[in-house]
Structure formats: structure tokens, C-alpha cells
Amino acid sequence: MDQNALKEQTGKESVKYIKSGMIVGLGTGSTVKYMVDELGKQVQEGKIKDIIGVTTSNRTAKQARDLGITIKDIDDVDHIDLTIDGADEISDDFQGIKGGGGALLWEKIVANASNKVMWIVDESKLVHKLGAFPLPVEVIPFGSQHVFDRLEKKGYKPTWRMDGDKKFRTDENNYIIDLHLGEIDDPKALADELIHMVGIVETGLFLNRVNDVIVGTPEGPKVLHAR
């Protein structure tokens, strides 16, 4: 099976965990797109009813609305029952790097408001230690070059996330700097260091935030219980 087939398998499998009446966090990314497509199909067929979606990006919101899924702003709900999202890397101890799609800030806010968080990935995303995938940090535009320079001095090998010939803009109109770290020995210490740097809004380190992971494999979807 190719990677897209594994993503589709995983996305469809995750919809089995969505029940009628739920408030569901809808993530962002290529695997989540398959999940939202399947959810929309089941909503249209009347198999899942009265659900509300809270999205982690404007593009997921558009996709969901086009499929007939009711969408509400996160501040218009008091909780989220289940959030289903992708991940760029998941370590052996279920820590994650997210933000390859540029939605890390909204993703973390939605995850924090959720009773349960599920990540859906193909098996290529499972790693022993985090760090091979570039770690995104979201920065406000004002003074962002100074933040970039500080990260460079620390040896974190920063690069600007680009959108064509311009700097990529998040849904909050911020920039993203990707850090090429190779391997992260202490994710918590790194997260604490980065979040205390003035100008950094959020990091792509998602630590102790996931409950279950569905992994797409050639033998079929596999569910891993994190906590």
C-alpha cells in the first residue's frame, strides 16, 4: 500500500470513534482530510447526527462546511468531546511534533479544550526519538528576525517557512520558523526554553497530549493507547 492509501485507511477508521451528538475537534493535514471526507459522507447519509465540529484551520473549516458539517468557533462551545488530528512525528513515549501544515497554534488550543485527543498517522510517522522532522515554532512578525538570529546562535539551524517567494503566514497571520535539530534528547526542556523566548507564540512540540493513536499499516489500522 502506498502512503496515501494508508492515510485514507487511517482517516476512515478514526470516524468510528465519532458518535452522534458529539462536539468534535477536526484537525489539519493530509490524513485528516480523509477523515473529514468520511465524516461528511456519514453526516450526509444520516449515520452520524447532530455533531458540531471545531476546526484547527480555516481550510479544514471550509472543507467541513462544504460537506454539510456544522462548524462552531471554539469560544462558542464549553468543551470538545474528541479531537482527531494528524502528527508529523510520534516518539516511543507518545510525544509528538506537529505543525507541518502550519496550524500548530490552533491545534494546541483545540487539543487543550478536548476531553480526548486521537492522532491518526501512517506508520512512517512513528520514531524512536523526535527531531528528524523539522520542529516548527510560530512567531509574531514584529521582531521575528531577532528571534531567528537567537535560534541560529543556539545552533538550532532555523529556516523560514516559505509560501512561494514570501514567508508563510498562519491563520493568525504569524510566521513559522522550522528548526532542524536532528534529534531531541529532552523535548520538555526544549519546549520550556522556546516558549519563554519573547516573540515565540507556540511550538510544535505536543507533549503528554494524546490519548490514542491510530496507525495505518499494510496489515490494517492499529490502535495504540498512550494514556
Swiss-Prot record:
<dbReference type="InterPro" id="IPR004788">
    <property type="entry name" value="Ribose5P_isomerase_type_A"/>
</dbReference>
<keyword id="KW-0413">Isomerase</keyword>
<feature type="active site" description="Proton acceptor">
    <location>
        <position position="107"/>
    </location>
</feature>
<feature type="binding site">
    <location>
        <position position="125"/>
    </location>
    <ligand>
        <name>substrate</name>
    </ligand>
</feature>
<comment type="subunit">
    <text>Homodimer.</text>
</comment>
<dbReference type="Pfam" id="PF06026">
    <property type="entry name" value="Rib_5-P_isom_A"/>
</dbReference>
<protein>
    <recommendedName>
        <fullName>Ribose-5-phosphate isomerase A</fullName>
        <ecNumber>5.3.1.6</ecNumber>
    </recommendedName>
</protein>
<comment type="function">
    <text>Catalyzes the reversible conversion of ribose-5-phosphate to ribulose 5-phosphate.</text>
</comment>
<feature type="binding site">
    <location>
        <begin position="98"/>
        <end position="101"/>
    </location>
    <ligand>
        <name>substrate</name>
    </ligand>
</feature>
<dbReference type="GO" id="GO:0004751">
    <property type="term" value="F:ribose-5-phosphate isomerase activity"/>
</dbReference>
<dbReference type="GO" id="GO:0009052">
    <property type="term" value="P:pentose-phosphate shunt, non-oxidative branch"/>
</dbReference>
<feature type="binding site">
    <location>
        <begin position="28"/>
        <end position="31"/>
    </location>
    <ligand>
        <name>substrate</name>
    </ligand>
</feature>
<comment type="pathway">
    <text>Carbohydrate degradation; pentose phosphate pathway; D-ribose 5-phosphate from D-ribulose 5-phosphate (non-oxidative stage): step 1/1.</text>
</comment>
<comment type="similarity">
    <text>Belongs to the ribose 5-phosphate isomerase family.</text>
</comment>
<dbReference type="InterPro" id="IPR037171">
    <property type="entry name" value="NagB/RpiA_transferase-like"/>
</dbReference>
<dbReference type="InterPro" id="IPR050262">
    <property type="entry name" value="Ribose-5P_isomerase"/>
</dbReference>
<feature type="binding site">
    <location>
        <begin position="85"/>
        <end position="88"/>
    </location>
    <ligand>
        <name>substrate</name>
    </ligand>
</feature>
<dbReference type="InterPro" id="IPR020672">
    <property type="entry name" value="Ribose5P_isomerase_typA_subgr"/>
</dbReference>
